[in-house]
Protein backbone atom coordinates (compact mmCIF):
# COMPACT_ATOMS: atom_id res chain seq x y z
CA UNK A 1 0.00 0.00 0.00
CA UNK A 2 1.28 3.46 -0.90
CA UNK A 3 -0.53 6.57 0.39
CA UNK A 4 0.72 9.82 -1.17
CA UNK A 5 -0.70 13.06 0.23
CA UNK A 6 0.78 16.40 -0.79
CA UNK A 7 -0.11 19.47 1.25
CA UNK A 8 -2.55 22.17 0.12
CA UNK A 9 -3.47 20.36 -3.10
CA UNK A 10 -7.07 21.11 -4.05
CA UNK A 11 -9.30 18.65 -5.87
CA UNK A 12 -9.90 21.06 -8.74
CA UNK A 13 -6.17 21.06 -9.62
CA UNK A 14 -6.07 17.84 -11.61
CA UNK A 15 -6.10 17.98 -15.39
CA UNK A 16 -8.42 15.03 -15.95
CA UNK A 17 -11.40 17.02 -14.61
CA UNK A 18 -11.32 18.86 -17.94
CA UNK A 19 -11.36 15.63 -19.97
CA UNK A 20 -14.09 13.41 -21.39
CA UNK A 21 -15.35 10.89 -18.88
CA UNK A 22 -14.66 13.19 -15.94
CA UNK A 23 -15.85 16.75 -16.54
CA UNK A 24 -19.51 15.74 -16.60
CA UNK A 25 -19.15 14.08 -13.18
CA UNK A 26 -18.55 17.28 -11.20
CA UNK A 27 -20.15 20.69 -10.83
CA UNK A 28 -16.96 22.66 -11.37
CA UNK A 29 -14.54 23.35 -14.20
CA UNK A 30 -11.15 21.86 -13.48
CA UNK A 31 -8.10 24.07 -13.23
CA UNK A 32 -6.01 24.28 -16.45
CA UNK A 33 -3.10 22.32 -15.01
CA UNK A 34 -0.63 19.87 -16.53
CA UNK A 35 -0.90 16.59 -14.60
CA UNK A 36 -0.27 13.82 -17.15
CA UNK A 37 0.56 11.16 -14.58
CA UNK A 38 -2.55 11.80 -12.51
CA UNK A 39 -4.62 11.94 -15.69
CA UNK A 40 -3.49 8.43 -16.62
CA UNK A 41 -3.76 7.21 -13.03
CA UNK A 42 -7.36 8.46 -12.78
CA UNK A 43 -8.40 6.25 -15.70
CA UNK A 44 -7.15 3.23 -13.73
CA UNK A 45 -8.61 4.30 -10.38
CA UNK A 46 -11.71 4.94 -8.38
CA UNK A 47 -11.87 8.73 -8.18
CA UNK A 48 -13.85 10.14 -5.27
CA UNK A 49 -15.15 13.51 -6.42
CA UNK A 50 -16.54 14.56 -3.01
CA UNK A 51 -13.73 13.60 -0.61
CA UNK A 52 -13.45 16.17 2.16
CA UNK A 53 -10.82 17.41 4.55
CA UNK A 54 -13.26 18.00 7.37
CA UNK A 55 -10.74 20.10 9.31
CA UNK A 56 -8.78 21.65 6.41
CA UNK A 57 -5.61 22.51 8.27
CA UNK A 58 -2.37 20.57 8.18
CA UNK A 59 -1.94 19.16 11.70
CA UNK A 60 -5.61 18.49 12.52
CA UNK A 61 -6.05 16.62 9.23
CA UNK A 62 -2.96 14.53 9.90
CA UNK A 63 -4.21 13.75 13.38
CA UNK A 64 -7.45 12.43 11.90
CA UNK A 65 -5.66 10.52 9.15
CA UNK A 66 -3.25 8.84 11.56
CA UNK A 67 -5.74 8.01 14.33
CA UNK A 68 -9.17 7.80 12.72
CA UNK A 69 -10.39 10.25 15.37
CA UNK A 70 -11.70 13.80 15.09
CA UNK A 71 -9.47 16.66 16.29
CA UNK A 72 -11.14 16.82 19.71
CA UNK A 73 -10.03 13.21 20.33
CA UNK A 74 -6.81 12.79 18.30
CA UNK A 75 -4.88 15.29 20.41
CA UNK A 76 -4.34 17.59 17.42
CA UNK A 77 -7.01 20.35 17.35
CA UNK A 78 -4.63 23.03 16.00
CA UNK A 79 -1.48 23.30 13.91
CA UNK A 80 1.41 22.05 16.02
CA UNK A 81 4.04 24.50 17.23
CA UNK A 82 6.02 25.07 20.40
CA UNK A 83 3.48 27.53 21.85
CA UNK A 84 0.65 24.97 21.69
CA UNK A 85 1.34 22.02 23.99
CA UNK A 86 -2.37 21.19 23.75
CA UNK A 87 -1.88 20.14 20.12
CA UNK A 88 0.16 16.96 19.68
CA UNK A 89 -0.62 13.45 18.51
CA UNK A 90 -1.73 11.31 21.43
CA UNK A 91 1.02 8.95 22.53
CA UNK A 92 -1.57 6.38 23.63
CA UNK A 93 -3.44 6.39 20.32
CA UNK A 94 -3.35 3.33 18.10
CA UNK A 95 -2.38 4.91 14.80
CA UNK A 96 -2.54 3.71 11.23
CA UNK A 97 1.13 2.67 11.32
CA UNK A 98 0.50 0.64 14.47
CA UNK A 99 -2.39 -1.16 12.78
CA UNK A 100 -0.42 -2.10 9.68
CA UNK A 101 2.68 -3.04 11.67
CA UNK A 102 0.65 -5.41 13.86
CA UNK A 103 -0.84 -6.88 10.68
CA UNK A 104 2.64 -7.85 9.49
CA UNK A 105 3.52 -4.93 7.21
CA UNK A 106 6.88 -3.24 6.84
CA UNK A 107 5.92 0.40 7.48
CA UNK A 108 7.72 3.46 6.10
CA UNK A 109 7.03 7.18 6.47
CA UNK A 110 8.53 9.82 4.17
CA UNK A 111 8.26 13.60 4.24
CA UNK A 112 6.20 16.02 6.29
CA UNK A 113 4.57 14.80 9.50
CA UNK A 114 3.54 17.97 11.41
CA UNK A 115 1.57 16.11 14.06
CA UNK A 116 3.79 16.53 17.14
CA UNK A 117 4.33 19.32 19.67
CA UNK A 118 7.93 20.48 19.07
CA UNK A 119 10.15 19.88 22.07
CA UNK A 120 13.87 20.65 22.53
CA UNK A 121 14.98 17.19 21.44
CA UNK A 122 17.38 17.79 18.54
CA UNK A 123 19.36 14.51 18.22
CA UNK A 124 22.56 16.40 17.36
CA UNK A 125 22.08 19.15 19.98
CA UNK A 126 20.38 17.67 23.05
CA UNK A 127 18.22 20.13 24.95
CA UNK A 128 17.69 22.38 21.93
CA UNK A 129 14.92 22.80 19.38
CA UNK A 130 15.67 21.64 15.84
CA UNK A 131 15.26 25.20 14.55
CA UNK A 132 16.22 28.61 15.87
CA UNK A 133 12.92 30.29 15.01
CA UNK A 134 10.38 31.07 17.71
CA UNK A 135 7.83 29.73 17.87
CA UNK A 136 9.37 26.48 16.63
CA UNK A 137 7.28 24.70 14.03
CA UNK A 138 9.65 21.96 13.01
CA UNK A 139 10.06 18.83 15.09
CA UNK A 140 12.11 15.67 15.35
CA UNK A 141 10.07 12.53 15.99
CA UNK A 142 11.90 10.03 18.22
CA UNK A 143 11.40 6.32 17.70
CA UNK A 144 8.93 5.95 20.55
CA UNK A 145 6.55 8.41 18.82
CA UNK A 146 6.62 6.88 15.32
CA UNK A 147 3.60 4.67 15.90
CA UNK A 148 4.59 1.50 14.06
CA UNK A 149 6.69 3.00 11.27
CA UNK A 150 9.98 1.09 11.35
CA UNK A 151 11.52 3.05 8.44
CA UNK A 152 11.64 6.81 8.91
CA UNK A 153 12.70 9.69 6.67
CA UNK A 154 10.77 12.67 7.89
CA UNK A 155 10.56 16.09 9.54
CA UNK A 156 7.88 18.14 11.29
CA UNK A 157 7.26 21.07 8.98
CA UNK A 158 9.66 23.28 7.04
CA UNK A 159 8.73 25.46 4.08
CA UNK A 160 11.99 26.00 2.17
CA UNK A 161 11.04 23.64 -0.63
CA UNK A 162 14.47 23.51 -2.30
CA UNK A 163 16.33 23.33 0.99
CA UNK A 164 14.53 20.55 2.87
CA UNK A 165 15.89 18.43 5.67
CA UNK A 166 14.97 15.05 7.09
CA UNK A 167 15.82 12.78 9.98
CA UNK A 168 16.28 9.12 9.15
CA UNK A 169 15.41 6.02 11.16
CA UNK A 170 18.50 6.45 13.35
CA UNK A 171 18.04 10.18 13.92
CA UNK A 172 20.71 11.34 11.47
CA UNK A 173 19.88 14.60 9.69
CA UNK A 174 20.03 14.89 5.88
CA UNK A 175 20.09 18.16 3.88
CA UNK A 176 19.76 17.13 0.21
CA UNK A 177 19.45 20.58 -1.50
CA UNK A 178 16.76 19.22 -3.83
CA UNK A 179 13.11 20.15 -4.40
CA UNK A 180 11.43 18.12 -1.70
CA UNK A 181 8.80 16.11 -3.66
CA UNK A 182 11.40 14.88 -6.13
CA UNK A 183 13.80 14.02 -3.34
CA UNK A 184 11.09 12.12 -1.48
CA UNK A 185 10.02 10.20 -4.57
CA UNK A 186 13.66 9.19 -5.01
CA UNK A 187 13.82 7.93 -1.44
CA UNK A 188 10.57 5.99 -1.90
CA UNK A 189 12.01 4.43 -5.05
CA UNK A 190 15.15 3.39 -3.15
CA UNK A 191 12.96 1.84 -0.46
CA UNK A 192 10.91 -0.06 -3.04
CA UNK A 193 14.12 -1.35 -4.65
CA UNK A 194 15.38 -2.21 -1.17
CA UNK A 195 18.64 -0.36 -1.63
CA UNK A 196 20.72 -1.04 1.46
CA UNK A 197 18.36 -3.78 2.66
CA UNK A 198 16.15 -1.23 4.40
CA UNK A 199 12.97 -3.32 4.36
CA UNK A 200 11.91 -6.89 4.97
CA UNK A 201 11.00 -8.13 1.49
CA UNK A 202 9.11 -11.06 2.99
CA UNK A 203 6.54 -8.61 4.30
CA UNK A 204 4.07 -6.45 2.37
CA UNK A 205 4.81 -2.73 2.67
CA UNK A 206 2.77 0.23 3.87
CA UNK A 207 4.22 3.56 2.73
CA UNK A 208 3.02 7.07 3.55
CA UNK A 209 4.48 10.01 1.63
CA UNK A 210 3.69 13.47 3.01
CA UNK A 211 4.87 15.88 0.32
CA UNK A 212 4.89 19.56 1.37
CA UNK A 213 4.36 21.38 -1.98
CA UNK A 214 2.12 22.80 -3.32
CA UNK A 215 1.97 24.32 0.19
CA UNK A 216 3.04 27.96 0.36
CA UNK A 217 5.36 29.70 -0.26
CA UNK A 218 4.72 29.85 -3.97
CA UNK A 219 6.18 33.12 -5.13
CA UNK A 220 9.47 32.36 -6.94
CA UNK A 221 11.59 29.66 -8.54
CA UNK A 222 12.89 28.91 -5.04
CA UNK A 223 9.54 27.22 -4.48
CA UNK A 224 9.09 25.10 -7.62
CA UNK A 225 11.01 23.59 -10.51
CA UNK A 226 11.73 25.86 -13.49
CA UNK A 227 10.66 23.28 -16.06
CA UNK A 228 7.24 23.16 -14.44
CA UNK A 229 6.97 26.93 -14.10
CA UNK A 230 7.75 27.34 -17.80
CA UNK A 231 4.42 25.67 -18.61
CA UNK A 232 2.57 28.56 -16.96
CA UNK A 233 4.86 31.60 -16.99
CA UNK A 234 3.38 33.16 -20.14
CA UNK A 235 -0.24 32.31 -19.37
CA UNK A 236 -2.53 35.26 -18.54
CA UNK A 237 -3.83 35.03 -15.00
CA UNK A 238 -7.43 35.05 -16.16
CA UNK A 239 -6.71 31.89 -18.16
CA UNK A 240 -5.36 30.12 -15.06
CA UNK A 241 -7.69 31.33 -12.32
CA UNK A 242 -10.99 30.46 -13.94
CA UNK A 243 -13.31 29.79 -11.03
CA UNK A 244 -16.40 32.03 -11.17
CA UNK A 245 -15.79 33.32 -7.64
CA UNK A 246 -12.16 34.34 -8.17
CA UNK A 247 -10.90 37.88 -7.55
CA UNK A 248 -8.02 38.58 -9.92
CA UNK A 249 -7.33 41.89 -8.19
CA UNK A 250 -6.03 40.13 -5.10
CA UNK A 251 -2.27 40.37 -4.68
CA UNK A 252 -2.08 36.61 -4.29
CA UNK A 253 -3.22 36.11 -7.91
CA UNK A 254 0.39 36.47 -9.04
CA UNK A 255 1.13 33.28 -7.11
CA UNK A 256 -1.09 31.13 -9.31
CA UNK A 257 1.67 30.31 -11.80
CA UNK A 258 3.95 29.06 -9.02
CA UNK A 259 1.15 27.14 -7.31
CA UNK A 260 0.22 25.33 -10.50
CA UNK A 261 3.90 24.73 -11.27
CA UNK A 262 4.19 23.00 -7.90
CA UNK A 263 1.11 20.93 -8.73
CA UNK A 264 2.78 19.78 -11.94
CA UNK A 265 6.00 18.98 -10.07
CA UNK A 266 4.11 16.86 -7.55
CA UNK A 267 2.48 15.04 -10.46
CA UNK A 268 5.94 14.31 -11.88
CA UNK A 269 7.22 12.99 -8.56
CA UNK A 270 4.13 10.80 -8.18
CA UNK A 271 4.67 9.50 -11.71
CA UNK A 272 8.20 8.41 -10.85
CA UNK A 273 6.86 6.22 -8.04
CA UNK A 274 4.25 4.69 -10.36
CA UNK A 275 6.89 3.97 -13.00
CA UNK A 276 9.09 2.19 -10.47
CA UNK A 277 6.19 0.06 -9.25
CA UNK A 278 5.63 -1.10 -12.82
CA UNK A 279 9.33 -1.74 -13.46
CA UNK A 280 9.52 -3.88 -10.33
CA UNK A 281 6.38 -5.81 -11.22
CA UNK A 282 4.60 -4.50 -8.13
CA UNK A 283 1.92 -2.39 -9.81
CA UNK A 284 -0.71 -5.14 -10.07
CA UNK A 285 -0.54 -6.05 -6.39
CA UNK A 286 -0.16 -2.63 -4.77
CA UNK A 287 -2.95 -0.36 -3.59
CA UNK A 288 -1.95 3.20 -4.50
CA UNK A 289 -3.81 6.20 -3.08
CA UNK A 290 -3.33 9.84 -4.03
CA UNK A 291 -4.91 12.34 -1.66
CA UNK A 292 -4.18 15.63 0.11
CA UNK A 293 -4.51 17.14 3.58
CA UNK A 294 -6.54 20.16 2.43
CA UNK A 295 -7.07 22.46 -0.52
CA UNK A 296 -6.20 26.03 -1.53
CA UNK A 297 -8.64 28.90 -2.11
CA UNK A 298 -6.25 30.79 -4.43
CA UNK A 299 -8.17 34.10 -4.68
CA UNK A 300 -11.62 32.51 -4.48
CA UNK A 301 -14.29 33.20 -1.86
CA UNK A 302 -12.93 36.69 -1.05
CA UNK A 303 -10.48 35.32 1.49
CA UNK A 304 -6.72 35.49 1.83
CA UNK A 305 -6.74 32.33 3.92
CA UNK A 306 -5.79 29.45 1.61
CA UNK A 307 -7.36 26.84 3.90
CA UNK A 308 -9.15 26.41 7.23
CA UNK A 309 -12.49 27.49 5.80
CA UNK A 310 -15.72 25.67 4.86
CA UNK A 311 -15.39 26.41 1.13
CA UNK A 312 -14.98 23.68 -1.47
CA UNK A 313 -11.62 25.05 -2.64
CA UNK A 314 -10.36 24.47 0.91
CA UNK A 315 -12.20 21.28 1.91
CA UNK A 316 -12.61 19.26 -1.30
CA UNK A 317 -9.47 17.15 -1.75
CA UNK A 318 -8.23 14.58 -4.26
CA UNK A 319 -8.81 10.96 -3.39
CA UNK A 320 -7.90 8.39 -6.03
CA UNK A 321 -7.51 4.67 -5.30
CA UNK A 322 -5.97 2.16 -7.72
CA UNK A 323 -6.03 -1.59 -7.09
CA UNK A 324 -5.98 -3.44 -10.42
CA UNK A 325 -8.50 -6.25 -10.67
CA UNK A 326 -10.06 -5.38 -7.30
CA UNK A 327 -11.38 -1.83 -7.59
CA UNK A 328 -13.27 -0.89 -10.75
CA UNK A 329 -12.10 2.41 -12.28
CA UNK A 330 -14.88 4.97 -12.00
CA UNK A 331 -15.88 8.32 -10.57
CA UNK A 332 -17.84 8.01 -7.34
CA UNK A 333 -19.42 10.82 -5.30
CA UNK A 334 -19.00 8.97 -1.99
CA UNK A 335 -18.70 11.55 0.79
CA UNK A 336 -15.45 10.35 2.36
CA UNK A 337 -13.56 12.29 5.02
CA UNK A 338 -10.30 11.90 6.92
CA UNK A 339 -11.42 9.66 9.83
CA UNK A 340 -12.89 7.17 7.34
CA UNK A 341 -9.43 6.23 6.03
CA UNK A 342 -8.20 4.45 9.16
CA UNK A 343 -8.63 0.65 8.75
Name every feature range the model reports, one short phrase each.
Residues 1-343:
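Formylglycine-dependent sulfatase
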Amino acid sequence: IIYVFPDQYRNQAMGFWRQDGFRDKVNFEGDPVHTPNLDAFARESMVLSSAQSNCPLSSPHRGMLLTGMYPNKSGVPLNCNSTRPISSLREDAECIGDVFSKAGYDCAYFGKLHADFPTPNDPEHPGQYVEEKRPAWDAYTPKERRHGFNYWYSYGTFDEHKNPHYWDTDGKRHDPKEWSPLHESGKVISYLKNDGNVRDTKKPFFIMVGMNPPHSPYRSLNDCEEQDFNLYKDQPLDSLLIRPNVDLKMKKAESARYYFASVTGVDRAFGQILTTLKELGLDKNTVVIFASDHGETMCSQRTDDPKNSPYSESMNIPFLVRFPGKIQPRVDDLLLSAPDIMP
